[in-house]
């Protein structure tokens, strides 16, 4: 159970991100990015399969905060923002972020470079074969949650 503290810390950071106005929370060297939370995010969700994540509002906000917070080395994202975290790494190849995603809409067959987690029953992250899958719920909203990874 070496990752119990790991997931609990990420859950707390993501809760703070969901509470913040811009859905981003920075704690020392970690940036936490909340998932889809408003109509703009729903629109931005549609950009992910078109490889246009860098044009989403959450990406723009996170990128600006990264410039103001060069100490950030770890990025934790849920759902939409899991994709945003991966895009931040792609757009900043000179950085080597430690990225963790929960329920991210990632399409990958095999292999895993970053720490990616999903739950069975989560339709949003269903195509991410590279994620570690935990037992989920038949309720897709519960299965898509960033909580309960312990």
Question: Which residues does each predicted region cover?
Answer:
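Short Gly/Thr/Asp-enriched flexible loops that form oxyanion-binding sites at enzyme active sites
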Residues: 88
